[in-house]
Structure formats: C-alpha cells, structure tokens
C-alpha cells in the first residue's frame, strides 16, 4: 500500500475506535477549567493564561493553580468561542490530535525501518493502547497530546533535514518546541532528544541547534517564572510527594517495571496509584532492576537510530514520571506511558 493509504487507515481506525467517547460529558477538572472558568469564555482572556495557571477563583479574579498550561487553555478558549460548552468538540479536538500523533509515530519509524507494515503496526499500538486512555479521553489532560504533537513535529523536521539546516527551519523547530513547552513542561524531553540526536549524528548542526534551543528554553523560563511566577507544584495527598530522594530512587525499578507490565497486560487500569516500596527485597527491587537492565542491554545489542531515540525518550520520560522528579504525585499514572 502507498504511504497515503496507511495514513488514511490510521485516521479512520482512530475515529472508529474513539467515536463513542465523543458523546462523553465533562468530568472532574473539565468543569473547573472550562465550564466554571470565565477566562475560557472570552478570547480576550487568552493572554492571561500565559501569566497564570489553569483554574479560576472569583476572590482574586485571575488564573490560579499549580499547573502552567497556557497553550491548552488557549485551545479550550478557541473551541469554546467556536462551539460553546458542548463537550463533543473538546473530545473531538483531543482525539484528532492523538490520531495526528499516531501518524507522526508512523512517520518516525518509517524513516528508519524503510518499510510501511511494521511502522504501521507500531503506530496502531500507540493509537489504541488502553494505557493512553486518560491522555486521550480526559479533556483536562489535553496537554498530554498537545506537548507530544508539537515535540514530534519539531523532531521530525530535524530528522528530515538533509545537508543544510536553514535559519527558517531552525526557527520553525524552535517555535514548535516552545509550543510543546507551553503545552506542558514535559516538552523538555524533545529538547533533550534534539540535542542528543544532533550531538551523536549531526554534529555540523550542533552550534545552531544548541543556540536556538537555549533561546527557546530561556523564553519559556521567562514566561513561566518571570511573567507567571509559576513554580513546580506538588500533590500533598501523595506519599511519594513527601518522600526523600533516596526513597524515590528505591521506588524507581518497581515503578518502571509496573509500567512495562501494564503495557504488556493492561488489566484493571486505574488513573493513579499511591503505593510505595519501603523495604528493598528481591521482588520489589532487585528482580525489576535485573529485568530492566536485560531489556536495556537487548535494545543496545539491536541498535538502530529509531531504537536509540525511543530508548532516550523513555529514559527521559521516566525521569520525569518516576520518583526522582521533585513534583511527583502518584506512584503510577496512566498519563504518559507513551505521551
């Protein structure tokens, strides 16, 4: 089949599988961030999202909270202006972005595997795996599909650069990465991937890439810390948020193994878990660590550029999701095994 046929199939399959979810209503933080948030009801309020958080309190009349998600809130406002408070269109936007992400995954693997069948299969796993359910179906977590969309767009642009990295292409890549950061701070993963790729495979691009990415990150820091004065928040009800660095590191093998286990056998999924490993033993530390090392070594032996990028992505991603990250909330989250 031709490339366009595979892309069309991904789009059709995605719409077919997620069609019923379009008719779900607003739940949880959807109401707080959209329905009960007057800032999302007027397009003129979009600049306020770059100077504050995602919630609203009438007492202070400004965006409040611990999350810095200006692009997601701007998207909510745009949808609200076009369609009102009908949740169908919010779900539709989130699902279409997720389908686009699956197409990006297909294009990424196709770039290195030089075939269509296997990349198509891998993109379907990304598209349909239940572990992605919260990121795709919970409107308040639209930031997950957004940061991945812009990060992947930037990465694919960099990977498709041939001999010359023009100023225009560099600017577009940097802009997409900035949008990824404005979607969620986890967009820093794609900055790391871009640097790793350039450092290892395209050293001739290193200086312009480092300069542009540093400038991008500085702009983000200015908006987040200088303008919005947003620090990283914590979830006080989560034991992991109160744990020491050593305790977090002790939990890392068990958490990573739990993600892998859930990916292979996604049964009885829950939004968040709050267990912790308090005592080191074979079952909760040494065995998971051994399995992870074996898998990593196997991946190293079967080295490929796509495998390296995927491995680096997961290493960086788990560094943000697992215990050593200072803002860690729950021990295990459905959000973001892939995204």
Segment roles from a protein language model:
Residues 1-339:
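Polytopic membrane enzymes that build or remodel cell-surface glycoconjugates and lipids
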């Amino acid at each position: 089949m031709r490339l366009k046929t595979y892309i069309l199939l991904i789009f059709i399959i995605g719409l077919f599988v997620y069609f019923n979810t379009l008719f779900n209503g607003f739940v949880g933080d959807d109401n707080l961030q959209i329905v009960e948030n007057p800032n999302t009801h007027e397009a003129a309020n979009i600049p306020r999202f770059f100077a504050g958080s995602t919630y609203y309190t009438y007492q202070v009349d400004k965006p409040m909270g611990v999350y810095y998600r200006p692009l997601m809130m701007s998207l909510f406002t745009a949808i609200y202006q076009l369609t009102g408070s009908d949740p169908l269109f919010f779900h539709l936007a989130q699902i279409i972005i997720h389908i686009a992400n699956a197409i990006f995954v297909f294009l990424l693997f196709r770039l290195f595997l030089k075939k269509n069948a296997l990349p198509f299969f891998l993109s379907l796993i990304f598209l349909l795996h239940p572990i992605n359910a919260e990121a795709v179906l919970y409107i308040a977590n639209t930031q997950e599909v957004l940061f991945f969309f812009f990060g992947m767009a930037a990465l694919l642009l960099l990977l498709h650069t041939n001999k010359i990295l023009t100023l225009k292409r560099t600017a577009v890549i940097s802009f997409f990465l900035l949008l990824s950061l404005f979607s969620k701070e986890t967009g820093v993963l794609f900055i790391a991937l871009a640097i790793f790729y350039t450092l290892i495979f395209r050293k001739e691009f290193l200086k312009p890439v480092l300069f542009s990415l540093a400038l991008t990150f500085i702009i983000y820091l200015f908006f987040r810390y200088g303008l919005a004065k947003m620090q990283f928040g914590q979830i006080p009800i989560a034991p992991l948020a109160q744990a020491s660095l050593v305790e977090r590191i002790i939990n890392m093998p068990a958490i990573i193994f739990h993600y892998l286990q859930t990916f292979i056998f996604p049964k009885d999924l829950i939004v968040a878990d709050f267990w912790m490993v308090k005592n080191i033993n074979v079952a909760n530390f040494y065995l998971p660590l051994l399995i992870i090392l074996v898998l990593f070594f196997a991946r190293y032996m079967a080295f490929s550029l796509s495998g390296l990028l995927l491995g680096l992505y997961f290493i960086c991603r788990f560094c943000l999701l697992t215990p050593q990250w200072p803002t860690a909330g729950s021990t295990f989250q459905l959000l973001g095994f892939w995204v």
